Curated annotation (Swiss-Prot):
Residues 331-342 have a biased composition (Acidic residues). It is found in: Nucleus. Residues 24-127 form the SWIRM domain. Keywords: Chromatin regulator, DNA-binding, Nucleus, Transcription, Transcription regulation. It comes from the Eukaryota. The keyword DNA-binding applies. Its main location: nucleus. The gene is SWI3A. This is SWI/SNF complex subunit SWI3A homolog. Residues 311-330 have a biased composition (Polar residues). Residues 1-22, 311-352, 414-445 are annotated as: Disordered. GO terms for cellular component: nucleus.
Amino acid sequence: MSPPVAGAASSGDGPPGRPPRELYTIPASSGWFQWDEIHETERRALPEFFGGAGGSGFGTASRNPRIYREYRDYIISRYREDTSRRLTFTEVRKALVGDVTLLRKLFAFLDSSGLINFSASPSRPEAQQQQRQTEAEAVVEAPVGLQVTPRPPPSYFAEEKGGGGNENGFRLPPLTSYSDVFGEWAPGMAPICGLCGMECRDGNAQILKDGFKVCSKCYANNDNKGEANIHPGDKKERIDNHSSSAWTDAETLLLLEGVLKHGDDWDLIAQHVRTKNKSECIARLIQLPFGEHMLGTVNGKLDNRLHKIQTTDGKVNKSTVKESSSQPTETVDDMQIDGNEDGADKSVEEHPTKHRRLFSSIDITVSLMEQLAHLTTSTSPDVVAAAADAAIKALGNENPQARRAFQLSEKEYQTRAFSSNHARQSDDVGGGDRDVEMHGHPDKKQGKMFISTTYQVRAAVATSIGVAAARAKMLADQEEREMELLMASIIETQLKKIQYKIKHFEELELIMDQEYATLQQMKSSLVDEWQKVLKRAFETGVPISRDEVLIKLFQNKPNL
């Protein structure tokens, strides 16, 4: 490479048999460049084409020294077609195929080294840079069809008279937010004026035709306050002083007291508070951290009171309780309570806001023996008798004295039967509840009766447990039988499917046999026709063709 020279390209003197060489100006720092070799500077600047950062080895099929030289030579040759014009990456990219990132990196390396765009006009880069800056800047202008006008001064609203300038009587102040004007009113805050954006602290608010609220001061300053501008249904809204004030401790205590007394009857709660309306009471209770929990506790107390009244009052009619194993909820209907109750108990008749289970499947007021009797009625008498015998035998094996508690002579049986009948007749004649007083029985006899009663209770409990176990065993056996039945049906269905498949395969096999027989017939007919054709050919004196060998082979081939 010739040393750098100043000025434009010139023609050099060469041998008489060679064409004149063209000289191109490059910076002195790029004197290492040679067309036939790849310098170490290029390897360090672009290690992707040389198999790593060290420059040793080869890359992939699209990244190797040969591809690099083709890219480099093309870019430099393209620039030297016209050295006065600045070469751009877009022009080079249209003719090269490869990784855009590597091509841009190679182009930047050649440009910074001065191998391209060194002799181009210096004014071109500045113009392009200025053009790029112009394109990057955002143009702020009004959309098509929209005319931007300056905002009138504040005195415009005071000086404007009549209905010509302000048709709707509503203009937003400069710093009014959307939530202040169009947002919902929050508890504890006064309404926001739509003109000045301030709170209406005086307690008066006017509703315009558009539905916005304005304070009394803005409404007085605004001349457009005729009957046509005011909403026909809401000409004036009087807001109490308590709406703009925050909740005090006394009001909160009254609210909690009203909730405890009236439950979820918000009309009565608002009357109890007196200074707040229904919506404010609801919002305040929701804002309290324990509001929902307190409301749930109140509903629970009402349910407990209902349960207590239903179980303890002697004049309560029996309620209809629908019990089902598949439906855990129960309803209590036709409940009538006699007696004088306060006004708070009237709210009990109302249905709660949520479905609650008022009673369990077994009432706690029912005696143990009644519960055991209820359990034993769910099975057959034979099972109950067997369970009772087993329980008595188990107690007898545990303690020999337990057998005496279940031994009853014929005389004692008749005595107890007579006493029970006599007591029943006396109850029918006298009526009412009578207290039975036990006199004259020694303590020893009472102790024996207590022991026998204890063993009887244990026997009853064991009987109920045995009945429950027997019922569970019966249910388990029933489920097992159902499972066996389902399994048998599944096996039968699978066997039917297999039989259908076997039948289908047999039909397919029969069809294949028929097709095979048809093919054999066609094969034999073709052989016969070929033989006839050859025979006729021999008779007419036609020379034997080479197909005769194939026919003989075909004839000698055994049938499949």
